[in-house]
Each structure stands twice: as C-alpha cells, then as structure tokens.
Amino acid sequence: MAARLRDYWDLTKPKVVALIVFTALVGMFLAIPGMPSVVQIQSGALGFLGIWLAAAAAAAINQLLDAKIDAQMARTSWRPLVVGKVRPVQVLVFAGVLITLSMTILTLWVNLITAVLTFTSLIGYAVIYTVYLKRMTSQNIVIGGLAGAMPPMLGWAAVTGLSTAADWINASLLVAIIFVWTPPHFWALAIFRRADYAKASIPMLPVTHGVQHTSRQILLYTVILSVVTLLPVATGMSGVFYLGAALVLDAVFLWYAWRLLDPPDELFAMKTFGYSIVYLMALFAFLMFDHWLRLADFYWN
C-alpha cells in the first residue's frame, strides 16, 4: 500500500510542485496590504489547496503524455508509468480526480477568476506545451513558460479576485520574473542532458543550435532577469531589504551565466541549473520577508 501511494505521489512531481505552490503562496501574502481578514485566510488556504491539486494533476498528465519520451531519457526512465508500476488508465483517472477536486474547491469556495486562470494554466502546460511546443520548436520553453509562470498570479487572485488594475499589474510583475527565469533554468539542464533530448527527438535549444549559442542565450535572459527582478522595487511593491537581496542573487546568477560561456562546461551547466532553483526560492522568500518587514514597521510606527 505504501509503495503504491509513493508511486502516485511521484506522478505529481512533488519537488517541482513544491516550488510552484511556494510562489503562489508568496503571491497571496503580497496581495494583502495589511493583516489578512478571516475571509482572506480561508480563501488563501483553499486557494493554496486548489492550486496544488491542479499543479499535481498537470504533472501527472505530463507524465502520461510523455511516457514514451521519458522511457528514452536517463533522467526520467525511473518514473512509475515508464517502469509499469501504474497503468495509463490509472494515471488518467488520478489526474481527473485531482482536476475535479481542484476546480470544485476554486469555483465554489475561492472565486471564479482563480479557477479559470488555474485551469487555463493547467491546459497550457499539460497539453499545449507537452503535446505541441515541446516537440515542435526549440523555443518551447520560452513560449510555454507562461503557463508555468502563472502561480503567483493564481495566489494573488485567490485572495483578491484581481479586482483592481493594481492587482493585475503587481501580480503580472511576479509572473514576469518566473517567465524570464524559466529559459536559463531549463536550458542549463538541457545542456547537461542534451544527448538524452537528442535521443528522444526533442528539439531543445542545445540540440538544435548547439551549446555555445544556448550559453549566450542563457546569459541574455539572465541579464533581462536581473532587470525584471528590480521592477517590484520600482513600482513600490517591495523595498530596500528585497532590493539588496535581489542584487546579490542576480550578481551570482550573472556570474554563473558568464562562467558558462567559456569554455562550455556540462558539469557547470548542472551547477547553474541547481543555483537557478535556489535563486527563485530565495528571491520569492525575500519578497515575502520584505513585505512582512514593511508591515511590521507600519504597525510599530
């Protein structure tokens, strides 16, 4: 029984989903200018659950549709569906249950806009990216990255309903950070795993354009990212504490991206990939801490 539960747990890509729902949680905290009301706490908790269920469902559908590809790649050849621990119909039913629960929670007890945006993001990743973009273009990560960048807006929507223009603008800034972060994050992994992608006929940028070109693109997007991460300060959403942290995190990421250029180093690409995960977690954590510090300063003064 425990082994079977673990198989279903693995279908949800728990580590990936954890980062997704963390950014959604930060979006919730940043959306509330003061102390949250009882209604906001309830909406936030149920929204968090609904977003997590949808992300888990998207991960399961991705594994269902990518089973043949996963079987050809060392990184994914262990997945439950690939090795026969679960059957395709079981994965389909599992994902369907998760989607039903997610949409029921978000529609009935959170708000309609969160449900619509969450479902749109799910389709964007699980179907449009997985079935079409991933297999058709080397810009798959760039175009499809929007679906994966949406969680902060989903979290923001859960507690505000995105009822004002300011809500849309501020939530969009958080989405923009993840959107621009996505290409250097995945391309670093793709450099390290490019033989796997080539074997599976997936046109990732290092496969179609080479490592050197991909490294230059990683640097370009990291430079853009270092600018985009300053926008929350420019708009007044975040303050000096976040600014200092963002500058340090950006400087380190830029060093990784620059170091990746000459000479192209596969092992260093994997280190860059690892740092990119730490980077995003830390950046959003500092966004949240900065928000709390500013709230504390407001109430103390």
From Swiss-Prot:
Cellular-component GO terms for this entry: plasma membrane
Other remarks in the entry: Carbon 2 of the heme B porphyrin ring is defined according to the Fischer nomenclature.
Keyword hit for Transmembrane helix: yes
Protein name, per record: Protoheme IX farnesyltransferase
UniProt membrane topology term: Multi-pass membrane protein
Membrane-crossing segments per the record: 16-36, 41-61, 93-113, 114-134, 141-161, 172-192, 217-237, 238-258, 273-293
Alphabetized InterPro entries for the sequence: Protohaem_IX_farnesylTrfase, UbiA_prenyltransferase, UbiA_prenylTrfase_CS, UbiA_sf
EC number(s) given by UniProt: 2.5.1.141
Keywords linked to the UniProt accession: Cell inner membrane, Cell membrane, Heme biosynthesis, Membrane, Transferase, Transmembrane, Transmembrane helix
Originating species: Xylella fastidiosa (strain Temecula1 / ATCC 700964)
GO molecular function: protoheme IX farnesyltransferase activity
General function of this protein: Converts heme B (protoheme IX) to heme O by substitution of the vinyl group on carbon 2 of heme B porphyrin ring with a hydroxyethyl farnesyl side group.
Domain of life: Bacteria
GO biological process, one term: heme O biosynthetic process
Broad EC category: transferase
Localization in the cell: Cell inner membrane
UniProt cross-references to Pfam families, sorted A to Z: UbiA
Membership in a protein family: Belongs to the UbiA prenyltransferase family. Protoheme IX farnesyltransferase subfamily.
Pathway(s) where this gene product acts: Porphyrin-containing compound metabolism; heme O biosynthesis; heme O from protoheme: step 1/1
Plastid as UniProt keyword: no
The organism's taxonomic lineage, starting at the top: Bacteria, Pseudomonadati, Pseudomonadota, Gammaproteobacteria, Lysobacterales
